[in-house]
Design a protein with these regions (language model features):
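Short aromatic/hydrophobic "clamp" motif used to bind/position activated sugar donors
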Residues: 190
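A short, conserved alpha-helix in the catalytic core of glycosyltransferases
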Residues: 205-207, 263-283, 288-317
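Conserved donor NDP-sugar-binding/catalytic core segment of glycosyltransferases
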Residues: 197-238
Length: 714
């Protein structure tokens, strides 16, 4: 795509500079690229080229600033304490006598399985919390599996009515204790519940509701919090080496990003609900992980291998002391068990975990750089955006213009070999695929040749998807949409016409999918009369034509940039972050003015990188977005906007953080990061090599992917 009508004004107003139409206005282009009033030629103030040093210097600063902003956010959003039961050890017999549970039926809905070894105080507190928050309308059995405790556990639990107390004659260890107790489970669902856990209101109802609200649920876990009120984990992620990360560790559990139900790599066995039949079929916890640790990770991976999903449901909250039940075994035993079982998990599941460990990086792709009849008609035969790119001039000292392409030159996208070279370059550095802008105006296509010739050929073999840039083409970009060249005409009939055209692409083997659902982006859903109805028509048409379900993501452009509207309001599955929209912090240019007619604005790239990278996540699926830079003065010489201090180092720091956040927040095919853009040359937003930076921005992409495997976060 390209920049929008109010780009310069929005940059000034700190709103959301976005894109402008690639069918550039010639009169503006010629006038605004005139060098008549520029005081100094470019050669008077040369800018340094990449030398392997200075272009990376912003990396450490930007990473540090991101960490500082996130820490400051945590400090200004204190957590709330939870009401935690804390029995006086001298009162344990009295507390045990007060426990009363209803007798379960012969075939209860849920069996709560509590493995214990000593720690009678914790066990009674756990049972008391269950009694306090057990739904009266659910048939529940409670099983306490005592692994030969040597304290007063047996004596204290003996008088408790309507619990099933199982006692091992000798200590079997956590894993075998759980597996042996499973033979006594009668419930349709089983909850593994550690005795150092206390449940809260609504916990069991919420966990059970997951199976009604989502498809193919195999296991679900709650939000774990510490007694201090801090988040312990909101699900967990796994790395191919077997190590895990507790999502949201020590964060505020009330943050929106931790408060929507989502799929995860695994959930902790400290509180895990699953269908009993499934658990018995797979044999419970694998004895490969004796005596304990990593058995819950393995269980969840096994459940997923059976074709089911593992969910985190934050509407169920439990308080977990963490490791109190294993503390008596000693730290040396614990660390040795962890080290051994991490190695076992790695050998068993590394290839499975590897499949989705790295987020897929998708670059927006502008299909503009070739002659089209509309450009010939309006601006002169043979006009392409290279005309604007090549004659841009610096407006102030330090302003990087013009941008001169290196490896690929001023290419023509009518040549399939150009697209092949682009694909080779992208894949060499770790880019997964391209998201082509798709232009449709009531049945008329524009700039369609690159993606059409891609569809008609098996080359290049690169994944791709489409983003419908569904807005009017206008002659002047003042935000008023006057002098419309080609108008949009959204209607029921057009909805069906456009999806029928798109289905051709969805059926291509290279088309990017999310869980086997073709991914379609919509640039401005708010321009439709009711995009939720449009999305419903699209989904129905795709089902009727054999495509199946599709995955629709809305771009957070214009008013959506900071609104945090849930995608479901528009009938969408997810949202796509689209920098620099919404978080710009304009500043005066830092260098001496060269163009006295310049009325545009600048901003510091490092600021936008920090703002987006440290931005709190919403309570829905939002794909992170990054950009290598931004400068639209090639189109608006006197009134454009630009970012200074755009360097590969700063970009890498931003991308690294986005990759890390994506890995924690999303699962599987939803681990996507979008880059704006591959080839937006007239906006200064491109990864393709230029003469100043060479391949360094592409190297930053590769570095960020590598660093995400090397930098371990607690």
């Amino acid at each position: 795509m390209t920049e929008h009508p109010t780009q310069a004004a929005e940059l000034a107003a700190t709103v959301h500079p976005l894109h402008e139409n690639p069918l550039t206005t010639p009169s503006e282009s010629v006038e605004q690229n005139s060098t008549a009033t520029i005081l100094l030629p470019l050669t008077a103030k040369e800018l340094p080229s990449a030398d392997g040093s200075w272009e990376w210097q912003d990396y450490a600063e930007v990473r540090a600033r991101i960490a500082e902003v996130k820490a400051a956010h945590r400090a200004t959003h204190p957590v709330s304490l939870f009401d935690v039961l804390d029995f006086d050890p001298a009162d344990l017999p009295k507390q045990a006598a007060q426990l009363q549970f209803r007798a379960p039926g012969a075939l209860p809905l849920v069996s709560i399985l509590i493995p214990v070894f000593n720690n009678a105080k914790l066990t009674l507190e756990c049972l008391a919390s269950i009694q306090q928050h057990l739904p009266t309308d659910l048939d529940v059995e409670i099983i306490v599996a005592d692994d030969a405790s040597t304290d007063h556990t047996q004596a204290l639990l003996a008088p408790v009515a309507n619990i099933r107390y199982l006692r091992n004659e000798q200590n079997l260890g956590f894993l075998r204790n759980c597996n042996q107790a499973m033979a006594h489970v009668n419930g349709a669902f089983t909850v593994y519940l550690n005795n150092d856990v206390q449940v809260t209101a609504g916990w069991l109802e919420a966990l059970l509701a997951t199976f009604a609200d989502f498809d193919k649920v195999g296991a679900v876990g709650p939000k774990f919090v510490y007694p201090s009120g801090h988040l312990q984990e909101a699900g967990a992620t796994l790395a191919p080496d077997g190590l895990s990360t507790m999502v949201g560790f020590a964060e505020n559990p009330n943050e929106p990003r931790f408060n929507y139900t989502r799929r995860v790599d695994y959930v902790s066995g400290a509180c895990l609900l699953a269908p009993t039949a499934l658990l018995k079929r797979i044999g419970g916890f694998s004895e490969e992980f004796l005596p304990c640790y990593c058995e819950d990770s393995d269980l969840c991976l096994t459940i997923r291998a059976e074709g089911f999903e593992v969910y985190y449901n934050p509407h169920a909250t439990v308080i977990h002391h963490l490791s109190k039940t294993t503390a008596a075994a000693g730290n040396d035993f614990k660390m040795a068990s962890i080290a051994n079982n991490v190695s076992v998990l790695n050998r068993k599941w590394a290839s499975t975990i590897e499949q989705h460990f790295d987020p897929r990086l998708i670059c927006f792709y502008l299909p503009q750089f070739h002659p089209v009849p509309e450009n010939d008609l309006w601006w002169g035969k043979g006009f392409t955006e290279w005309a604007n790119v090549s004659k841009a001039q610096p407006n102030f000292v330090g302003h990087y213009q013009p941008r001169i392409p290196a490896d690929l030159g001023y290419y023509d996208l009518r040549l399939l070999e150009v697209m092949q070279a682009q694909a080779d370059l992208a894949q060499r550095y770790g880019i997964h695929g391209f998201c082509f802008y798709y232009y449709w105006f009531d049945g008329k296509r524009l700039l369609e040749r690159p993606v059409e010739q891609l569809l008609q050929s098996d080359k290049p073999d690169i994944p791709f998807c489409l983003c419908w840039a569904n807005e009017n083409w206008t002659r002047r970009w003042d935000g008023l949409e006057q002098e419309v060249l080609i108008a949009q005409a959204h209607s029921d009939e057009d909805d069906l016409a456009v999806i029928n055209d798109l289905i051709r692409f969805f059926k291509d083997g290279r088309y990017i999918k999310v869980d086997d659902r073709p991914l379609m982006l919509i640039y401005r859903p708010t321009l439709f009369p009711d995009f939720a109805k449009t999305a419903a028509r699209w989904r129905e048409a795709c089902r009727e034509q054999g495509v199946g379900e599709i995955y629709i993501a809305m771009v957070e452009s214009f008013g959506l940039a900071t609104a945090n509207f849930h995608p479901s309001q528009f009938g969408c599955d997810a949202a796509v972050e689209f920098p620099p929209g919404g978080l710009v912090q304009p500043k005066p240019p830092t260098g001496e003015m060269l163009n006295p007619d310049f009325i545009g604005h600048s901003a510091d790239y490092r600021d936008i990188a920090v703002s987006f990278a440290s931005r709190p996540g919403p309570a829905y699926t939002r794909f992170k977005g990054v950009m290598p830079g931004w400068d639209n003065t090639a189109r608006r010489q006197h009134a454009g906007g630009c970012f200074e201090r755009s360097t590969p180092g700063a970009f890498q720091a931003w991308l690294e953080e986005s990759i890390a956040d994506t890995r924690q927040q999303h699962f599987g095919d939803e681990r996507l990061v979008f880059i704006n853009a591959w080839n937006e040359w007239a906006e200064g937003a491109y990864l393709e090599p230029d003469r100043r930076f060479g391949h360094t921005y592409l190297e930053a992409v590769s570095n960020a992917l590598d660093a995400s495997r090397l930098l371990k976060k607690n």
